[in-house]
Amino acid sequence: MRDPVPFTKGVVALTALATSLSLACGPGEPRTDAERLARGREIIERMSAKLTAAPVFSVTTSEIRDEIRSSGASEQVTLTRATVVRKPDRFYSVVTGGRHNEVWYDGVGLTLVLHNEKVFAQSRAPETIDKTLDALYERYGLSTPISDYVYTSPAKALLTEKTTGGWVGRETAGEQQLDHLAFKDTGVTWEIWIPTVGDPLPQKTVTQFADNKQVRKIETTFKDWNLAPQIPEDRFSPTVPADYEGIAMVQRARVLRNMPKDEGAAPPPPVDKK
């Protein structure tokens, strides 16, 4: 049997312990799973509201992608992506680094150019960015790390009723304090770092895919957020080098089976060649 602690010393020890625990958790910090999820959702909603309120924006991202080649070998690809958005119906993105691609969406059609391969593809597209992003995923299985933040409501794209996880803690990057959030949903786990004060715009994300046969992990760093960029009108007009070959955008078989013939046969929008 241990020697009992004198009453006065015991009170002092308990007080010190309580104080240290309080400081470790921080005032008002979530302590339960439900509180952590609620805090995480609150921060995502705040970030979403900021982007929703911006009719135009531009951002540059650096991506480190862990991919699986058709041979089954692992490959790490590093990309830089510059994105320009004008809601509700204009989008442009250029990718450099391990690949060199451009995408234009002008409210009528979508044009994809693969510069390394010297080919381009076109397809008619719905009338809004939101519907076009949905169509790209459903028809072609295409999605990018920036896609969720381009939607009218990023929170609705990122969070579902099945989402678990939430607030992890606060971290410092340089002189900036960030809220670190981690979530899990069907087939995916993802983390995001958002400034605690100032504009709540994403600074970094890490996404891991459990069942994706092509991409296992994407680490994305955001920089140069601009919520009031000056965008030339021709930014959203596709231009393709004259010697590039046009190819078809192959849709998922299940979509083609259920698509009306007239929709599947719709001609692509016109494109200007340099």
Language-model-derived ranges and their functions:
Residues R2-L14:
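Bacterial N-terminal signal peptides that target proteins for export
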Residues S22-A24:
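C-terminal motif of bacterial Sec signal peptides marking the signal peptidase cleavage site
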Residues E35-V119, A182, G187:
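N-terminal mature ectodomain segment of secretory-pathway/periplasmic proteins
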Residues P30-R31, E35-I43, S71, L112-Q177, ...:
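Flexible, processing/modification-adjacent segments and terminal tails
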Residues S62, E102, T111-V113, L158-A253:
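Gly/Pro-enriched, hydrophobic low-complexity segments
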Residues V250, V255-G264:
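Secretory-pathway-linked proteins and extracytosolic
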Residues G26-G28:
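Bacterial signal peptide processing site
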